[in-house]
Every structure is written in C-alpha cells, then in structure tokens.
C-alpha cells in the first residue's frame, strides 16, 4: 500500500494536481494549497491507483453500495464500483426540477451498508451530507473514504493520502537553491 501511495503522490504532482497560490475552497476556507483530484482523476493510471488503493482499504469492510456527491467523487466512485463490483448511487448537490426530478442517480435500499466516497475532504460537510442522505434512506454508513484528507475537519476520515503527505513529497522533489 505504501508503494501505491508513493506512486499516486508522484503522479498527482507530475500532472499538476497540487497547486500553490491563493485559493478559496468549496468549504469557503482560504488555502495556499489546492489539491485538484478532479484533474488527477482524468488520467486513467491515476484513477486506477485511486480505486486500487480504496479497494485495499475497504477489503475487510462489509458493505453493499458506494455513494458519492456530484461532481468530484463521481469518477472515483465509478472506478471503485467497477473494481469492487458494487452498485453506485450519485447524490446531486441540488434536486432537479425537470425530468424525473430526483436528488440522486441510482438508489439506496433500506438496510444497506454504504461507503461514501469523496475526492477531497476539508471540513467533511459534503461527505457528511451524503452520509445523512444515506441514513435518511434507511441505510447505514459503513465508512467515509477520500482520496485526500486536508486534515482540517477535526475528524478521522479514512483516506489514501493526507495533505501533508502531498506537500512533503512536493517539497522533497523540488530543486533546492544553492
């Protein structure tokens, strides 16, 4: 697992998924570091590493379904669904007012155990919102897992990487001035 995490970090840095500057995160917080897992997940090798890493972390967990919130978690949840042969539900951020007017694509059945997948967790509000919706459907949350935990939520979420791992790796491969 360590080798996979190292390879994932290296590839994420190579494709420019770790950015430095002044950013406003979806949580509303400001940060000097942005982790663009959406960009990273557009590369098949990275997406495969993510799904393999998550599958390894979840291998001993009993669950029936994978859930995510649009948009960032979708490619990751789809890849994990394919890898683990588990059905998927995608929660919309807002209920549609056209078509079938749903708040999700797919279903959650009463009594199921569901794993919620996220791209990046900062405060955890998006993941916890999905977890609440799972529970409102009569199912239970078996786990919440993210590609990157920014370590700002005050909670211990399952993740493949911590933001500090990415920054440390980035700093170690940058040329130093002599």
UniProtKB/Swiss-Prot annotation:
GO terms for biological process: 'de novo' UMP biosynthetic process; pyrimidine nucleobase biosynthetic process. Pathway: Pyrimidine metabolism; UMP biosynthesis via de novo pathway; UMP from orotate: step 1/2. It catalyses: orotidine 5'-phosphate + diphosphate = orotate + 5-phospho-alpha-D-ribose 1-diphosphate. Orotate binds at residues 122, 150. GO terms for molecular function: magnesium ion binding; orotate phosphoribosyltransferase activity. Its EC number is 2.4.2.10. 5-phospho-alpha-D-ribose 1-diphosphate binds at residues 92-93, 96, 118-126. Keywords: Glycosyltransferase, Magnesium, Pyrimidine biosynthesis, Transferase. InterPro entries: OPRT, Or_phspho_trans_dom, PRibTrfase_dom, PRTase-like. The keyword Lipid metabolism does not apply. Pfam families: Pribosyltran (PF00156). Its cofactor is Mg(2+). Catalyzes the transfer of a ribosyl phosphate group from 5-phosphoribose 1-diphosphate to orotate, leading to the formation of orotidine monophosphate (OMP). Homodimer. PANTHER family: OROTATE PHOSPHORIBOSYLTRANSFERASE (PTHR19278), URIDINE 5'-MONOPHOSPHATE SYNTHASE (PTHR19278:SF9). Belongs to the purine/pyrimidine phosphoribosyltransferase family. PyrE subfamily. This is Orotate phosphoribosyltransferase. It comes from Archaeoglobus fulgidus (strain ATCC 49558 / DSM 4304 / JCM 9628 / NBRC 100126 / VC-16). The gene is pyrE.
